[in-house]
């Protein structure tokens, strides 16, 4: 057993999990449950009353957090301590939205001035492009941005840009390319005019396989359409640490933005990786996004554990994963603009907490990161919600909805809200056999048929959910929401004693992929790998099955 599972608090939680009453009983016993189990901060409202939790549950979870020294670990992150121990790096994405501009030390120096310089450089770049001052090689202004990245440098900018569609004020179009499948970039290029297109390549090394391949394809297209090598600087910019490679490619050094080792890819949208966002919504709105995230940082760093939104959400998710065998967690966004958030939170959580050893290398004897998935309400209600209501797996859910719509048409938003709240109620209370029989009482069915159908209509309920609300989706509230999930992820990793900031599984995939690529291009059939890999490579080389 690990230290965590040996703790008396862990053992108490395990025993306590067997004694939790049904949520119907909890609500019936305490009419003030909603008031007691909800809180507001940073423009967000969290209702966590529809959880299998009592005051004793929460007290035990908070005690577990204290035993794990969560307070100290939070302080260590914000202070710039080396908490990514396997890569010997600080974790300071919070510094990117540090609007207070207090001194933050990383690698022996105050990083705040460079962060602010980069924001100012972004401001100049955005102004130049959006004002029409930046000209392409034929003298035309830029109309289209193509953001080329992978992982965090792709998903963050894409999802945030999509979410903030009502704030697109610059008149530009933006296209996102990540997958190395040639179809992805080919379909984008078909829509574009090389004279008015600006590519932004995001890769720390300027060598990430997918990103470099797509960028080289974009450059070849640009040159084939009439541009010259000397024109590349007018149509390509980069976010990278490798200035030498970027300038060698043809990018002007003035249009190269930095990346830092103390910012992981999945936490990087707040940096110059967010240039596509800023080019669409303008720098004032981009700074508002940072402001909202900073507000959540401040709340996370300073609020007591018992009133701390990321802490409460993280602990409740851990509660279900470790004591109820919940293997997945669903995120349901009742706002069309937020439809991409489940995929973003999927990467954030699963890449961070998909680990199986503790910081000292001990194999864990408890579940860590769950599968994160989800989608857009009300679409999901006609698909996978059936499994949430009557399936055999326990799947905790987060419902996210703005109270006000950017498009208040007729009763659309009223219906959306009623569906959202109705789903949380249905998951919580379910439907008993007696209730199902009562619904069938006036039907022409026989009593035997009524009983059979009623059994199929029974729903156990007691399915946990959180509801997150905001007045309206704005850059500020979106920033706070994303930072909330970042810190929720941190909380779980801190208690599980794992490193939430490396990704060795991703690195292994890259290494083996490069090895396979070499064998695909070899002159002879593959024979030295396992039989399956050899067979697949050789089938691919033949081009037919």
UniProtKB/Swiss-Prot annotation:
The keyword Amino-acid biosynthesis does not apply. Its main location: cytoplasm. It catalyses: alpha-D-glucose 6-phosphate = beta-D-fructose 6-phosphate. It is found in: Cytoplasm. One of its GO terms (molecular function) is glucose-6-phosphate isomerase activity. One of its GO terms (biological process) is glycolytic process. The active site is at 351 (proton donor), 382, 510. It is an enzyme of class 5 (isomerase). It comes from the Bacteria. The keyword Isomerase applies. Its EC number is 5.3.1.9. Pathway: Carbohydrate biosynthesis; gluconeogenesis; Carbohydrate degradation; glycolysis; D-glyceraldehyde 3-phosphate and glycerone phosphate from D-glucose: step 2/4. Belongs to the GPI family. Catalyzes the reversible isomerization of glucose-6-phosphate to fructose-6-phosphate. This is Glucose-6-phosphate isomerase. It comes from Shewanella oneidensis (strain ATCC 700550 / JCM 31522 / CIP 106686 / LMG 19005 / NCIMB 14063 / MR-1). The gene is pgi.
């Amino acid at each position: 057993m690990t230290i965590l599972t040996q703790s008396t608090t862990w053992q108490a939680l395990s025993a306590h999990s067997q004694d939790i009453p049904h949520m119907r009983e909890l609500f019936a016993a305490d009419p003030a449950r909603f008031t007691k189990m909800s809180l507001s901060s940073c423009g967000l409202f969290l209702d966590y009353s529809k959880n299998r939790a009592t005051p004793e549950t929460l007290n035990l979870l908070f005690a577990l957090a204290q035993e794990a020294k969560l307070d100290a670990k939070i302080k260590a992150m914000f202070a710039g301590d080396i908490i990514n121990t396997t890569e010997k790096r600080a974790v300071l994405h919070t510094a990117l939205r540090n609007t207070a501009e207090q001194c933050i030390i990383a690698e022996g120096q105050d990083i705040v001035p460079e962060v602010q310089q980069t924001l100012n450089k972004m401001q100049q770049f955005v102004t130049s492009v959006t004002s029409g001052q930046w000209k392409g090689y034929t003298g035309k202004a830029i109309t289209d941005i193509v953001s080329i990245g992978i992982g965090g440098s792709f998903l963050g900018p894409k999802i945030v840009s999509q979410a903030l569609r009502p704030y697109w004020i610059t008149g530009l179009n933006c296209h996102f390319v990540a997958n190395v499948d040639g179809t992805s970039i080919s379909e984008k290029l078909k829509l574009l005019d090389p004279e008015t297109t600006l590519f932004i390549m995001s890769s720390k090394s300027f060598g990430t396989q997918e990103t470099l391949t797509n960028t080289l394809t974009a450059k070849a297209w640009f040159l084939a359409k009439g541009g010259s090598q000397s024109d590349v600087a007018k149509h390509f910019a980069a976010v990278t640490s490798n200035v030498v490679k970027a300038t060698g490619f043809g990018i002007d050094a003035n249009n190269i933005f930095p990346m830092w080792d103390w910012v992981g890819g999945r936490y990087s949208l707040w940096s110059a990786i967010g240039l596509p966002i800023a080019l669409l919504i303008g720098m004032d709105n981009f700074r508002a996004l940072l402001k909202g995230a900073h507000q959540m940082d401040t709340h996370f760093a300073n609020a007591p554990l018992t009133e701390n939104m990321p802490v409460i959400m993280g602990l409740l998710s851990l509660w279900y994963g470790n004591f109820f065998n919940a293997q997945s967690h669903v995120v349901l966004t009742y706002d069309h603009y937020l439809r991409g958030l489940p995929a973003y939170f999927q990467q954030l959580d699963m890449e961070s907490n998909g680990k199986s050893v503790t910081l000292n290398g001990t194999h864990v004897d408890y579940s860590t990161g769950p599968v994160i998935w989800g989608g857009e309400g009300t679409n999901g209600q006609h698909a996978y919600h059936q499994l949430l209501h009557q399936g055999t797996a326990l799947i905790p859910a987060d419902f996210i909805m703005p109270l006000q719509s950017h498009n208040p048409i007729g009763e659309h938003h009223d219906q959306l809200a009623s569906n959202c709240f109705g789903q949380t109620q249905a998951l919580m209370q379910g439907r008993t056999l007696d209730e199902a029989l009562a619904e069938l009482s006036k039907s022409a069915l026989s009593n035997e048929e009524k009983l059979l159908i009623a059994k199929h209509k029974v729903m156990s309920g007691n399915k946990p959910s959180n509801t997150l609300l905001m007045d309206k989706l704005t850059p500020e509230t979106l920033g706070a929401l994303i930072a909330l999930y970042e810190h929720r992820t941190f909380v779980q990793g801190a208690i599980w004693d794992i490193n939430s900031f490396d990704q060795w599984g991703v690195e292994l995939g890259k290494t083996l992929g490069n090895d396979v690529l070499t064998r695909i291009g070899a002159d002879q059939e593959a024979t030295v790998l396992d039989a399956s890999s050899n067979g697949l490579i050789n089938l691919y080389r033949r081009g037919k099955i």
